[in-house]
Design a protein with these regions (language model features):
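Conserved hydrophobic/aromatic pocket- or pore-lining residues that grip, position, or stack substrates
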Residues: 192, 258, 279, 304, ...
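Cytochrome P450 catalytic core segment centered on helix I
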Residues: 200, 213-284, 351
Length: 391
């Protein structure tokens, strides 16, 4: 009798385990508050297609295809909607009068357990504002203008390296072809190394990535695994164990490199201001907990380098693909300056076509290849004319 009862309980438990996901899928497809929003049914039913695309690194391209099929508003997960509309930025990211603020989605942005906050992971607006206030003086127009000689130094070195490449002989002809994308990365990382840590990564000098920069790119893959695991809280620990040890090591090594760089910079006085100068008090102590400095400068290293290089690469690609635009830009620049030394930040601001090209580059090649998810505030709200429930 006891054996029969045990078998019955096991069978009932198994039936419940099977019934739950089926019922959940039916609910998501037909009864969920987002059920009427267009989108692929497989993505609306479960998070699995979303997470697969995230781990494979195709999610941004998949979203673009979905918007081409379903329009500017697409349901890309049971509880997630994406927008490809000009009003979306103002509705989601700006604080609108009479509306509650859309906060960062903690599934994406919250720090990992046991890790310190960064300017990126700070969910509460007041915490983000505190960190931003400390760093802001380093990003004023006056502060950035003071760094112009340093920026010019690395831009000149980039131009020299490009001249060197153009002088190489390939297939018996002078003028070798080369991928300019990595060279933009070399430049922006070297500049941020000086501005953030008081010393260059010497990528341009050595014509290759610093080993730590290579680690940084590899760590993005680990971040995708971790983000996907967070969508399944009941089995997150088990999923985290499925992340390859090699990727976990990459993330650990990447963070340790940041720790070493920050500690090295804090150990000496620099003869010029940099971003870290605004974090250090006059008595040598810091305005932020050391953990927050590590985490924030890890974010800034990527945000201040790779993003700029991505936009420059995309903009250059558009220019070489459209000879008329390239010729017009070339004419504007060469008619405005007699020599390279005349190309100051102030002078470049006066070139309208250059400004238009850079703005169009930012529009067509956005430097952040991510969705930047936000949570609908309590009570729900409207985005681009579409009502969304809270959460």
């Amino acid at each position: 009798m006891a054996v029969f009862e045990t078998q019955s309980l096991v069978a009932a438990a198994a039936a419940l385990l099977l019934a739950y996901p089926v019922c959940k899928i039916v609910y998501n497809l037909y009864f969920h508050p987002l059920a009427k929003i267009p989108g692929p049914r497989a993505w609306a039913a479960t998070r699995l297609p979303y997470c697969r695309a995230l781990i494979q690194g195709t999610i941004v391209h998949d979203f673009e295809k979905l918007h081409q099929i379903y329009g500017p508003v697409v349901r890309t997960a049971p509880d997630e909607v994406t927008f490809a509309h000009g009003d979306a930025y103002n509705d989601i990211f700006r604080v609108r009068q009479g509306h509650k603020q859309f906060l960062k989605d903690p599934v994406w942005w919250a720090r990992q357990k046991g890790q310190p906050d960064s300017i990126l992971s700070a969910i509460r607006p007041e915490n983000h504002a505190r960190i931003r206030k400390i760093l802001a003086p380093g990003f004023t127009t006056r502060a950035l203008k003071a760094q112009e000689p340093l920026v010019q130094k690395y831009v000149n070195l980039l131009i020299q390296r490009m001249h060197d490449k153009a002088s190489e002989v390939e297939d018996g002809k002078k003028g070798a072809e080369f991928d300019i994308g990595p060279w933009f990365n070399f430049t922006t990382f070297d500049i941020f190394g000086e501005l953030g840590f008081g010393e260059s990564f010497d990528c341009l000098e050595n014509s290759r990535y610093h080993p730590w920069i290579a680690l940084l790119f590899s760590s993005v893959k680990a971040a995708a695994f971790i983000s996907a695991a967070k969508f399944f809280p009941l089995i997150t620990l088990m999923l985290m164990k499925c992340i390859p040890e090699s990727l976990k090591k990459v993330q650990r090594d990447h963070f340790q490199q940041i720790v070493d760089k920050v500690d090295r910079r804090l150990s000496w006085e620099l003869d010029r201001p940099d971003f870290m100068s605004h974090v250090i008090k006059s008595d040598g102590t810091t305005k932020m907990p050391i953990g927050e400095i590590y985490a924030t400068f890890m974010v800034m290293t990527t945000a201040g380098s790779e993003t700029t290089a991505t936009t420059l690469s995309g903009t250059m690609n558009h220019l070489v693909s459209q000879p008329d635009a390239l010729a017009k830009l070339t004419k504007e620049v060469r008619s405005a300056f007699q020599s390279e030394s005349d190309m100051t930040l102030d002078a470049l601001h006066d070139l309208p076509y250059l400004d238009a090209v850079l703005r169009e580059g930012l529009r067509t090649c956005p430097p952040v290849p991510w969705m930047l998810p936000r949570v609908v505030p309590r009570g729900g709200d409207t985005v681009c004319g579409t009502w969304l429930p809270e959460g």
